[in-house]
Amino acid sequence: GGVILVGGSAVGRGSVIGAGSRIDGCVIFDGVTIEPGATVQDSIIASGATIGANTRIDGCVVGEGARIGTRCELKGGMRVWPGVEIPDSGVRFSPDA
């Protein structure tokens, strides 16, 4: 399917959002890759970050160049620092990674 972009979301130049993804109330900076089936809500995704397929992110900040693996779940105001990698199937609720 297509991409669902709602809630006043903004997407920067050169960003790629995969099929079946939902972006709601987010700021997506330049050069971000969001793989198919991801859901990103009320979050900020910094330049060059990658969000893996079928990952759910809610209320988080993902730093520049960070990589979130496939089938991950991040929520609760979590901050992923620049360049950090969260492995596939990771579930994080703590404030910092």
Where are these regions (language model features)?
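Left-handed beta-helix
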Residues: 1-97
